[in-house]
Amino acid sequence: MIALLQRVTQAQVTVAGEVIARIGPGLVVLVGIERGDGPPQAERLLERLLSYRVFADSKGHMNLSLADVEGALLVVPQFTLAADTGKGTRPSFTPAAPPPLGKQIFEYLFAQAKARYSRCAAGRFGAHMQLSLTNDGPVTFTLQIPPAVQTATTE
């Protein structure tokens, strides 16, 4: 599971001209679900997101977590994060989880986020979205949770 997190002052997601999610100060997290990802990877990512210290303390050091500053969390599915860009001039999306599984894992991640943290919003899996945000800093990090080891299958 791959996450690109950005510290923001505000963000919103629009689908078909309608704003479906909006947050104030907090984190926007673009999430790429890979083959082999499941609930354990979602749990580990969420654990890290809620405790990752990317907000400034009184001395200006990145020492405070999202929960410490009572910021908001906006999670947005983005399968392109799982692309293989190693060869050629066109990305391959083979490493990304198949859409039904990706949706299931993303929805699980968001449900767990809402259960653990009240200030959550989400983009819509499979939708063409417009994401607008004001990056604060800018502060941007990638987090990777390795997928479970897959065994070869014969078809």
UniProtKB/Swiss-Prot annotation:
Cellular localization per UniProt: Cytoplasm
Cross-referenced InterPro entries: Daa-tRNA_deacyls_DTD, DTD-like_sf
Molecular-function GO term, any one: tRNA binding
Enzyme class: hydrolase
GO process terms (BP): D-amino acid catabolic process
Pfam name, any one: Tyr_Deacylase
Keywords: Cytoplasm, Hydrolase, RNA-binding, tRNA-binding
Gene Ontology CC terms, in alphabetical order: cytoplasm
Residue window of motif Gly-cisPro motif, important for rejection of L-amino acids: 137-138
Catalytic activities: glycyl-tRNA(Ala) + H2O = tRNA(Ala) + glycine + H(+); a D-aminoacyl-tRNA + H2O = a tRNA + a D-alpha-amino acid + H(+)
Enzyme Commission number: 3.1.1.96
Assembly behavior: Homodimer.
Family: Belongs to the DTD family.
Comment text on domains: A Gly-cisPro motif from one monomer fits into the active site of the other monomer to allow specific chiral rejection of L-amino acids.
Family matches, as PANTHER family: D-AMINOACYL-TRNA DEACYLASE 1 (PTHR10472:SF5), D-TYROSYL-TRNA TYR DEACYLASE (PTHR10472)
Function, in words: An aminoacyl-tRNA editing enzyme that deacylates mischarged D-aminoacyl-tRNAs. Also deacylates mischarged glycyl-tRNA(Ala), protecting cells against glycine mischarging by AlaRS. Acts via tRNA-based rather than protein-based catalysis; rejects L-amino acids rather than detecting D-amino acids in the active site. By recycling D-aminoacyl-tRNA to D-amino acids and free tRNA molecules, this enzyme counteracts the toxicity associated with the formation of D-aminoacyl-tRNA entities in vivo and helps enforce protein L-homochirality.
Name of protein: D-aminoacyl-tRNA deacylase
Organism phylogeny: Bacteria, Pseudomonadati, Pseudomonadota, Gammaproteobacteria, Chromatiales
